[in-house]
Amino acid sequence: MAVIKGITPEQVAQICIGHYAGVDEVGRGPLIGNVVTAAVILDPNNPIEGLNDSKKLSEKKRELLFEQIQQKALSVSVGSATPAEIDELNILHATMLAMQRAVAGLNIKPTSVLVDGNRTPDFGVESHAIIKGDGLIDAISAASIIAKVVRDREMDALALQYPEYGFDKHKGYPTKAHFEALTQHGVLPEHRKSFRPVREALA
């Protein structure tokens, strides 16, 4: 595994060859729900305009790109790790597991895997960790969009089940509103019990 910081156009050209997969995660910070990862192999003959780090895109733009990625990419796969797995393994190792699941779910075996961040799990193929890769490599940008939309939809579904928690607004992140809901309404089965605010609410 190589960790690449400040990637140059020449390095991009060297590693973005063959059926390479971009991988990214969403949901390491929230107090509730799955950590969600996605793996995407784009079609160089069917480009998608406007790809970028999902955090820099509006919800409407993410939804539009989500549909385009599903339609135009050669392969798209989502992998998750549950709150129970996060509590058992810790969030870092659970995220690595979710990434492995996403790559394993691709219907094309990638020639290499490019991951946003500073580390990758073992995928059984060449892999590169690219710092800020979600804004530099289109396949990683696409993966960040897929993972973000999937997780946001999971939070919206949870908001319908537990409307008093406001998950549709804060998406499970540790906001003041979430802390107040924990205090007033208690811990849900979907909360991550190993995260300190949840642990303190259980005490």
UniProtKB/Swiss-Prot annotation:
The enzyme's E.C. designation: 3.1.26.4
InterPro entries: RNase_HII, RNase_HII/HIII, RNase_HII/HIII_dom, RNaseH-like_sf, RNaseH_sf
Name of one Pfam family that matches: RNase_HII
Enzyme class: hydrolase
Span of domain RNase H type-2: 18-203
Main location per the UniProt record: cytoplasm
Keywords carried by this UniProt record: Cytoplasm, Endonuclease, Hydrolase, Manganese, Metal-binding, Nuclease
Cofactor comment: Manganese or magnesium. Binds 1 divalent metal ion per monomer in the absence of substrate. May bind a second metal ion after substrate binding.
Cofactors demanded by this protein: Mn(2+); Mg(2+)
Subcellular location: Cytoplasm
GO biological process, one term: mismatch repair
Binding site for a divalent metal cation: 24-25, 116
One GO location term (cellular component): cytoplasm
Keyword Cytoplasm in annotation: yes
Catalytic activity: Endonucleolytic cleavage to 5'-phosphomonoester
Molecular function as annotated in GO: manganese ion binding; RNA binding; RNA-DNA hybrid ribonuclease activity
Stated role: Endonuclease that specifically degrades the RNA of RNA-DNA hybrids.
Family: Belongs to the RNase HII family.
Name recorded for this polypeptide: Ribonuclease HII
Species this protein is from: Shewanella halifaxensis (strain HAW-EB4)
